[in-house]
């Protein structure tokens, strides 16, 4: 999975897909009551990027629905995963539940269309800190109350704050979640980051019987040397400001027979087992 990073304006969606991304990450900004208003990162953000691009959240969902709906004139078959970077750290953790209700409702109304020809992409809920776990409970509660639990099959969870992996597992256990989990490891592209925690996450992923990390990705990679380092370790995904650079690295002899781009036929919740 090549995740285009910080794809917050509607016109950027096709731009990043044209560069080779098959997944996009966008920032969801909330008001003080936990209502998702905009896809917007704000200042500061990654080096070399414009931090202020944005769209109205519901309009953005309407657009990516078209891009991920077969038969729609805007359909792009390569876009298979949407990662919502939920900016919950900007609001009180008491509002995390309200935020979960709001995001689930907006996805039902604007993306899934409550079963009426909605978008098909998988959804990854990127939650900054384990203290905001009530968001997940609220999201699942809302799908159940609205009679649309079938969409749970399309939704995954990812804690992105580089917290202790065992603490994350404990929170997932508390929530009763042991499926559809990704684990991110990384830092803004402005700073270097070692591989200690990334290696630990990959080790857990590869431990037989360990359910809490089937997929691991590294972010935000801009240098080809760091992309190669992550691929050598065996990550499932790379988030980058430059998807075309990732595509180039994947074509190199060292990687071309080990990796391929994920398609809609690949289940993002299953641990990859080499043949």
Swiss-Prot record:
UniProt xrefs under Gene3D superfamilies: Phosphatidylinositol (PI) phosphodiesterase
Example GO molecular function: phosphoric diester hydrolase activity
Subcellular localization, as worded in the UniProt entry: Secreted
Secreted is among the record's keywords: yes
EC number: 4.6.1.-
Residues that bind Mg(2+): 25, 27, 85
Cofactor binding summary note: Binds 1 Mg(2+) ion per subunit.
Gene Ontology BP terms: killing of cells of another organism; lipid catabolic process
GO cellular component: extracellular region
UniProt keyword list: Cytolysis, Dermonecrotic toxin, Disulfide bond, Hemolysis, Lipid degradation, Lipid metabolism, Lyase, Magnesium, Metal-binding, Secreted, Toxin
Protein name as catalogued: Dermonecrotic toxin SpeSicTox-betaIIA3i
Native source organism of the sequence: Sicarius peruensis
């Amino acid at each position: 999975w090549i995740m285009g990073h910080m794809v917050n304006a509607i016109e950027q969606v096709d731009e990043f897909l044209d560069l080779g991304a098959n997944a996009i990450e966008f920032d969801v900004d909330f008001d003080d009551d936990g209502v998702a208003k905009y896809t917007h990162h704000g200042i500061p953000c990654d080096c070399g990027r414009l931090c202020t691009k944005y769209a109205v959240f519901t309009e953005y969902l309407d657009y990516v629905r078209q891009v991920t709906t077969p038969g729609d004139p805007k359909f792009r078959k390569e876009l298979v995963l949407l990662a919502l970077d939920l900016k919950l750290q900007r609001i009180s953790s008491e509002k995390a539940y309200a935020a979960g209700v709001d995001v689930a409702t907006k996805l039902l109304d604007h993306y899934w269309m409550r079963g009426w020809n909605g978008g098909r992409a998988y959804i990854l809920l990127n939650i900054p800190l384990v203290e905001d776990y009530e968001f997940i409970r609220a999201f699942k509660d809302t799908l159940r109350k609205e009679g649309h639990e079938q969409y749970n099959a399309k939704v995954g969870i990812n804690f992105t704050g580089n917290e202790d992996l065992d603490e994350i597992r404990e929170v997932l256990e508390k929530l009763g979640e042991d499926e559809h989990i990704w684990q991110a490891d990384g830092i803004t592209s402005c700073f270097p980051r070692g591989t200690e925690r990334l290696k630990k996450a990959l080790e857990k992923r590869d431990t037989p019987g360990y359910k809490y990390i089937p997929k691991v990705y590294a972010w935000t990679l801009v240098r080809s040397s760091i992309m190669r380092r992550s691929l050598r370790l065996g990550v499932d995904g790379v988030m980058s400001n430059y998807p075309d650079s990732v595509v180039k690295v994947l074509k190199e002899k060292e990687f071309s027979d080990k990796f391929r781009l994920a398609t809609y036929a690949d289940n993002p919740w299953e641990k990859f087992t080499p043949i």
